[in-house]
Amino acid sequence: MAGARAALLPLLLHLGSLALAARGGEVSREQPRLADAISQQQAPSHSLVPGETHQQQWCPLEERLERLEAEVTDLRKQNRELQARVVQLESCECWGPGHTCPEGARWEPDACTACVCRDGTAHCGPQPNLPHCRGCSHNGQSYGHGETFSPDACTTCRCLAGTVQCQGPSCSELNCLESFIPPGECCPICRPGCEYEGQLHQEGSSFLSSSNPCLQCSCLRSLVRCVPVKCQPSPCLNPVPRLGHCCPVCQASGCTEGNSHRDHGQEWTTPGDPCRICQCLEGHIQCRQRECASLCPYPARPLPGTCCPVCDGCFLNGREHSSGEPVGSQDPCSSCRCTNGSVQCEPLPCPPAPCRYPGRIPGQCCPVCDGCKYQGHEYRSQETFTLQENGRCLRCVCQAGEVSCEEQDCPVTPCVRSASGPQLCSACVLNGEEFAEGIQWEPDDQPCTSCSCQDGVPVCRAVLCSPVPCQHPTQPPGACCPSCDSCTYHSLVYANGQNFTDVDSPCQTCYCEDGTVRCSLINCPFTTCAKPQNGPGQCCPKCPDCILEAQVFVDGERFPHPRDPCQECWCQEGQAHCQLRACPSAPCVHPLPGTCCKNDCTGCAFGGKEYPNGADFPHPTDPCRLCRCLSGNVQCLARRCPPLSCPQPVLTPGDCCPQCPDAPADCPQSGNMVPVRHQEHFFQPGDPCSRCLCLDGSVSCQRLTCPPAPCAHPRRDACCPSCDGCLYQGKEFASGERFPSPNVACHVCLCWEGSVKCEPRTCAPAQCPFPTREDCCPACDSCDYLGVSYLSSQEFPDPREACNLCTCLGGFVTCTRRPCEPPACSHPLIVPEHCCPTCQGCLYHGITAALGETLPDPLDPTCSLCTCEEGSMRCQKKPCPPAPCAHPSPGPCFCPVCRSCLSQGREHQDGEEFEGPEGSCERCRCLAGQVSCTRLQCPSLPCLHQVTEPGTCCPRCTGCLARGEEHPEGSSWVPADSPCSSCMCHKGIITCAQVQCVSACIWPQEGPSDCCPQCSGCEHGGRKYEPGESFQPGADPCEVCICKQKREGPPSLHCSRRQCPSLVGCPPSQLLPPGPQHCCPTCAQALSNCTEDLVGSELVPPDPCYTCQCQDLTWLCTHRACPELSCPLWERHTTPGSCCPVCKDPTQSCMHQGRWVASGEQWAVDACTSCSCVAGTVHCQTQRCRKLACSRDEVPALSPGSCCLRCLPRPASCMAFGDPHYRTFDGRLLHFQGSCSYVLAKDCHGEDFSVHVTNDDRGRRGVAWTQEVAVLLGTVAVRLLQGRTVMVDQHTVTLPFLREPLLYIELRGHTVILHAQPGLQVLWDGQSQVEVRVPSSYRGQTCGLCGNFNGFAQDDLQGPDGRLLPTEASFGNSWKVPKGLGPGRPCSAGREVDPCRAAGYRARREANARCGILKTSPFSHCHAVVPPEPFFAACVYDLCACGPGSSSDTCLCDALEAYASHCRQAGVTPVWRGPTLCVVGCPVDRGFVFDECGPPCPRTCFNRHIPLGELAAHCVRPCVPGCQCPAGLVEHEGHCISPEVCPPVLLTGD
């Protein structure tokens, strides 16, 4: 029973735990009972209660067990119910896309996947029934929906709903001359380095020109930029030149200023002007303005008391903006904000477009579905375009932001016929390799070049680099384009993320971040002294150091005195202050004096004497007292007399104790030392640490005891440790002594009164990431990189990358790819274990080939084979068999086949018929590569007058075409714009004239809309005519009447003279008079044809009353209206050859330009038109010019006195404007304010011309404006004066003025234009702006203020002797003319001035605001072609110089007009004038209106017959603003008139 009950125990425990876990609320009640049961079970078997049986003990346990079994059964039932409930809930719903879905619900996560909720589980699968969900096919490969793949290393594509979307690399735009794509890269980079004067220079390097040491050049992004070295004026009398240097130097000495002495080379800031820095150079003080670093693009103005602008705000467009404040943006699609001196712009947010390829519409910011943007190109909606992808040709259409494409056949490359007969397609051979027509490739030996095959000629050009998105990119060796992986700053390369100090400005700390260097001024620590100092080359001021005993100590440092360690010193304000150290109190009363303090308790100082520890000595004043030294304390006691053995002791005078008459024996000592007396204490010689006593000749000794030392490191004295010094690590040190720690490196220890204290040596933080430790402190004079030390400027292999080469430079380590020698082959192989390519194999377009291996060309695998020869792939076409036909077409591999025909560059299918060669009038047919042709048969025409047009085979009937409407031969009609005129078509010629009325009745009636009076009723001569009938009313066969039915009322007669057709081109000898009963004359030969060559021309037919013009391949002849005459009919006559009658006064003069011209007098209107007065009428003739074709580097030009143009080299322009600013031929902007006469531009080689300007200060000192211009042409002198007055050889002339063949001067708008024979043009506005244009044939031959015109702006400051001058003022003064053409007057030389500084801050601010219009929308279209910044600076300069008032408006307009003139030259015409801004008044009463860029050759009465296109082509004058006639009117004698009232103009030949 006990065993069974024992077996129940584990079950009881298990059930109890289940019950307790299930019923948390009954734990407190059941747990004691269960514990009782367990404790009872585990208790000993004997009963502790007398008389209690085992049955009585187990009964409670069995009852509890039954209760637990019932509870467990109940728990199991509840558990089963819960599990069933969970299963039921799971089968009722699913978790869908972000929410629960009921049973049976269906949803689509994407366009090609469908999901269904079944039994609580989401079952998802593809939808193959949809066509676009079955995947994609690309280049013969199949891809599933959503699959991403890369057809090549630079393209990533994705299959989405049956459409393949591919995206190429995003390459930044480059700005260098040569670029290339490195192997394995997708984007081009700039080729590093520059070539200048026959030498190669590394990218970022700075160097002096070898031919001119006064030019400082730099190589940046493969371009060389040079600026003149500015030599400061030498402060000494005899400067010494140095070989190879530009500027002479003085011999060394110091400077004295007031009470201050400066050393040579020392710099300081002058008090009161923080921007002025002075320097002592060779005994002379030179001061200059501080150059502020450009820390941000738009810094705020300097704080009061400081010099340089700060980056805590922005100064933009003349306004101050705090950081974080919004600023205006020129791009309406961007929002800009000022951020710490920079302007950051973000595009405005755009809503998502409901189409896949939305496009951009001009004027809108966000893409919309009205167009398409596909593969980087914009297309209009419904526009169709073609693409070529991977050899396939696609035809695509844009529809509301969606692009759909379908494949089509690609056009066959045209082939040419060879001399031997078969047709061959052109190919290109470059460096022994053959390339097919139209293919593009990169030469392997020129990685930065892209080539293409065009018509059999290889065309190669440098790869253009995209602009990098950083300011200081680095161009790695071997790369074409710069990258932003590191920074090149001041010719040094820094790694990304590297902090460094600017080598040129040590007060700046810089940081390289993604190719852009951001610099900020070093924050100097606060100084505690009153007068901090700046040393040479020192950035931050610091307190002066102290010098004591020839040793230097920094400010604030505490240190022991070099010669007296008992003194502690400190450095303050450059002075060393010292005092005795504070001594610790001694732990004894009578210490010995130590090295510095009296606290040595190893002995006693008592009564003016020193005693060792333990010594007994008599009291200095009481001999009967005996004293003892005990660790610095003295104990004195009365002597105790020993008991005597004798009965009668004797007291000797001077002794304290009586003695027996027989004295005890002394104690002898070794050597010759004095014996020790009885009862005397002494120390044994050589053992000062033992104390002995002599007793009647016997010696007893005992060791002295030492007290504990009150310090940590006492030194050992003769017997006991002493705190007067230190014993540390086996070495003794004096108190106050400093020494290096023997245990810990770079720690310094101090011994003070027996204790040693060690602390780390203080070091300044290193300013580099890889410093080395020298003398315990980090130093940047070398590098500690990955545990290895390297010297500065040392190159070493990268321990982490075998193919990298690292350079240590001042504690910074920069690692780049190890440069490789260029391989001697074109397709080297890159082996993984080698850093550089090798020629022991070939790598050709991603395919590796062994030496001698032949394989198909990857670019043309079907038709070309390539062989690897010593690292270079040699590719050639497979040979083609000859074709057995005469006109084969290109087949596979461009081999000729006879399946179709190639004729005239086009392919024709077999059996196809086509037109023969142009002009052959043949019809051809293609049969198996053979072409047979037959001549066309023209159909017969029903008309007599036929014409065969050039380029056509068959003739056509010469009908008439007027205003786009065809009129048949012999027809007549009324023009819509002239109801009283009548036109007729006769033999292809249209003749129009006013209806000439004839009266057929006595009382004709004329209505308001009638052209001629009508006769009511259709009755004439007693006969009545029906509507539509016509008859001849009299004997004149030219008169005819027609009966016409009116809308209302009876019919009426309309009578007029017949209109005769114009006989254009009929010679007078061939004219036939009209026969009987005929009205019009005829011509015995064919009339003239209006061909394309004659379109726009005018001819005078035999009838002088008509003028004929060739339009739409049809002669249009109109009848001339004759003016009414005031003389009676009998005084009128018609001159032979003229149309209109004139009064019989052959001497009648003509009115021309406000003056009377005698009859018969002739004059020239311009170079192309001459006029004469004939009997009171002006007759003019105009010369016509042939079309002129100039080469690319030439432009049409006009010679003085010549009508027709000639080709001259393309010109360059130089301008002087404003106060005055000079923009040279090479584009440099100069400021020079001399008020004398100067050479502006001159032919310094051939002496062809010389242009001088005379400046005037207009009453303001230090500034000037151009007053007049003088042009010298050989012996002829022309002066262009104020108000557009012109003098030639001291005589005032009227414009236009011609002196053949040298000179022609004219007035266009408000601008005087001078044309001279060498191709020179001078434009003068009559106030202060002058422009000189010379052809490029004068390149490198000019001199003067306009520069030398050599294409290099940096050397424009050359004086007459050819030397570069340091300042613009000295340059301008060197070109002073000794005596001008005008009257002599006093003048002043130019000097360097800053009118804004003199005018003050308010004037500068107002000038900035007014000149800000240059950067606003009226000029925005010009900003891309002509940068506005130089003109903005010139405008501010001028407004400060002009001062307030009305003169400032003129100065502003001069600057704005100068910029607008440059814009017009670049092809952009800004519309910038307003009602209150630079208004130009025009004589409105004479019909003129202002035009910013009107036609330079306006329409006049003398050129109105010339077509507009021909007139514009032959007008080479510059576009100038001025007053023009509006459309529909022509200019004549200073008025705008209708063309109909112009005098007659007769056309002549060339």
UniProtKB/Swiss-Prot annotation:
SUPFAM superfamilies: FnI-like domain (SSF57603), Serine protease inhibitors (SSF57567). Glycans are attached at residue 340. Residues 1212-1388 form the VWFD domain. It is found in: Secreted. One of its GO terms (cellular component) is extracellular space. Residues 1489-1542 form the TIL domain. Weakly expressed in embryonic kidney and brain. Not expressed in adult tissues and several cell lines. Residues 1-21 form the signal peptide. Enhances bone morphogenetic protein (BMP) signaling in a paracrine manner. In contrast, it inhibits both the activin-A and TGFB1-mediated signaling pathways. Interacts with BMP7 and, by doing so, enhances binding to the type I receptors that contains cytoplasmic serine-/threonine protein kinase domains. Also able to interact with activin-A and TGFB1. This is Kielin/chordin-like protein. It comes from Mus musculus (Mouse).
